[in-house]
Amino acid sequence: SPSSPTVFPLVSCESPLSDENLVAMGCLARDFLPSSISFSWNYQNKSEVNQGVRTFPTLRMGEKYAATSQVFLPPKSVLEGSDEYLVCKVHHGNTNKDLRVPIPVVTEMNPNVSVFVPSRDAFSGPAPRKSRLFCEASNFSPKQITVSWLRDGKPVKSGFTTEPVTPEDRGSGPRTYKVISTLTITESDWLNLSVYTCRVDHRGLTFWKNVSSTCAASPSTDIQAFPIPPSFVGIFLNKSATLTCLVTNLATYDTLNISWSSRSGEPLETKTKLTESHPNGTFSAIGEANVCVEDWDSGKEFVCTVTHRDLPSPQKKFISKPREMNKTPPAVYQQPLAREQLILRESATVTCLVKGFSPADIFVQWLQRGQPLSQDKYVTSAPMREPQAPHLYFTHSVLTVTEEEWNSGETYTCVVGHEALPHMVTERTVDRSTGKPTLYNVSLIMSDAGGTCY
């Protein structure tokens, strides 16, 4: 005789639940007769789930039948959606049954936020001298997070870059993540007591960390280590990748040891540099090691190990080049000086606009007749997000030369280096007579003293 099905929910057995893989949910119907049965899925708001649904063939179990239906949800739907369950709708003959299948929950962990305060001698370069603030959010889950900066309570819209979120190496237990954001600041703003705020938004909560040269918001006294990836400028000019490990909040340099190694344990030659004291009475140090560009680009993982008598155990920080990084080469446009400048017989200004690139790390240099110009001749802005394409960046570099140099027919070349370019470099050259971009040999600016891989 006909028998209606008994319906059971099926949920993922994966523990801890990952926020990177598809989340599986299912519905089991058993002990029904005859064998004809169908399934459908609805969201909590009753709209139909029309993707990721898979229904398996009916199986005979003794004198009756069983069948299952499975649905795969993208992690974003689980992490950012408001649904607490899906509805499995079972249709068998004249019988319809609805079953609520709870959506698994990813373990939520709030981020730990810390900001590194630069030392007095950390500012360098032509006026205005600059340094960087580092904001690290660590030990958080799930992965979705936003980091932004404020200066004196007002949002900072440019001059900072945020690295891709990376998983932490915790072994067992819930998967956690970390992210580092870097803000470029000027020495004058820092000494004028500007208050900088790192704002971290995660799962509807906001976390703040304020810093200034007065240390109004006292930083943590715990020793902190920050692994800093190689810059493209260093790779482009020196043909080697420099790993940097920044150690902060040191009460003393005594017993400090910073060492780099590969994930397999192979030690790397590490040079340690010490800094002067910070306004809050602590010290900082950095440990640098050069590795082959090929090893870095391949995604090989490296470890910074810090030991100090104030640490209960060695502190290890892992770093590797993100593999999921979106790479887009830049478009380069050179704009000659305006006619109004020539009429006024002022100094000549040439602009190089670099657009639509990713990642944000980029190198811009100016040449005169193929020779590098001094950095005090030009100013390059920090990469900023494209207004209409926030996953891409743009920057511009402004070169100023004398009217005599421009009128003499000197050629000026804007050289742009970026890892997504076919040969990592492109250039545009302009002069008074042509005003049109031409090619120039840029090999003179590249160092031959880089590291060699064996």
From Swiss-Prot:
Cross-referenced CDD domains: IgC1_CH1_IgM (cd21819), IgC1_CH2_Mu (cd16093), IgC1_CH3_IgAGD_CH4_IgAEM (cd05768)
Keyword Glycoprotein: yes
Keyword entries, A-Z: Disulfide bond, Glycoprotein, Immunoglobulin domain
Annotated region described as CH1, given as residue ranges: 1-105
Pfam families: C1-set
Signal peptide, first to last residue: none
Residue ranges, annotated region (CH4): 325-454
Region: CH3, residue numbers: 219-324
Superkingdom of this protein's organism: Eukaryota
Disulfide bonds: C27-C88, C135-C198, C245-C304, C352-C414
Entry-listed glycosylation sites: N45, N112, N192, N210, N238, N257, N280, N441
Residue ranges, annotated region (CH2): 106-218
Chain ranges passing through the membrane: none
Protein name, as recorded: Ig mu chain C region
